[in-house]
């Protein structure tokens, strides 16, 4: 029997390496791939929201919105979304923070197409066949942090300066999608910036700032 919608509220965080909690310093040192749960924005948000909430992490490094990576299989967000929704339901809120990996040079996508990928995920959430006792969750679209310009000096990077430019353009396109689809919106680039270590991934301070901002959004939606 499906769990009813009781007092406990559940938030699904669907994203890429910055939801997984990729640790750029630990990776550079070769001793840790992931921040501890209490450092990741998902873990910090769990603490801020308190015992009446359950935060479900669904972050995967390299995940795209709707595209198959030609070099590494299994990274298409659309291909993983239904399983994530089904296993975590009932849900009160779904946070989608994807798009950075769509900016890779192998895709060459403009900001508008990346935003359409996010829109496809939003529509998939809305159309998901929720079990009895579940109603459609609210949706938060998060435009990802900018890619740092230092990426130009990274050897064999999957990103280039065009990727940096697109990372500065997607927030406008994401906001349009959020308005059209009736979703909440947060521009993470206004809150946090990538680590100077690899110019892509968040520092612990960035995770904390993002957690505080998203906790406010989630609580606000719960009160509606």
What are these regions (language model features)?
Residues 2-59, 69-70, 84-88, 94, ...:
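Serine-esterase "nucleophile elbow" of acetyl-processing enzymes
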Residues 3-7, 51, 75-224:
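Alpha-helical cap/lid subdomain in secreted, periplasmic
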Residues 18, 25, 62, 101, ...:
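Residue-level marker for beta-strand->alpha-helix junctions and adjacent short loops that shape enzyme
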Residues 21, 63-65, 149, 195:
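Generic structural signal for helix capping and beta-alpha/helix-loop junctions
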Residues 56-64, 192-193:
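Short connector loops at secondary-structure junctions
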């Amino acid at each position: 029997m499906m769990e009813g919608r009781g007092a406990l509220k559940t938030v699904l965080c669907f994203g890429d390496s910055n939801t997984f909690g990729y640790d750029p310093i630990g990776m550079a040192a070769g001793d840790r791939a992931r921040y501890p749960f209490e450092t990741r924005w998902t873990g910090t948000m769990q603490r801020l929201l308190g015992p009446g909430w359950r935060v479900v992490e669904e972050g995967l490094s390299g995940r795209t919105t709707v595209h198959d990576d030609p070099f590494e299989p299994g990274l298409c967000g659309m291909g993983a979304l239904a399983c994530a929704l089904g296993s975590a339901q009932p849900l009160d809120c779904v946070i989608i923070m994807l798009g950075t990996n769509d900016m890779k040079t192998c895709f060459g996508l403009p900001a508008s197409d990346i935003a359409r990928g996010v829109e496809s995920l939003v529509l998939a959430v809305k159309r998901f066949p929720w079990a009895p006792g579940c109603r459609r969750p609210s949706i938060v679209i998060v435009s990802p942090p900018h890619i740092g310009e230092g990426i130009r000096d990274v050897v064999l990077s999957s990103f280039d300066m065009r990727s940096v430019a697109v990372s500065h353009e997607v927030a406008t396109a994401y906001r349009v999608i959020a308005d059209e689809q009736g979703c909440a919106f947060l521009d993470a680039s206004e809150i946090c910036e990538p680590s100077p270590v690899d110019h892509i991934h968040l520092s612990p301070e960035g995770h904390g700032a993002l957690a505080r901002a998203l906790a406010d959004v989630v609580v606000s939606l719960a009160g509606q």
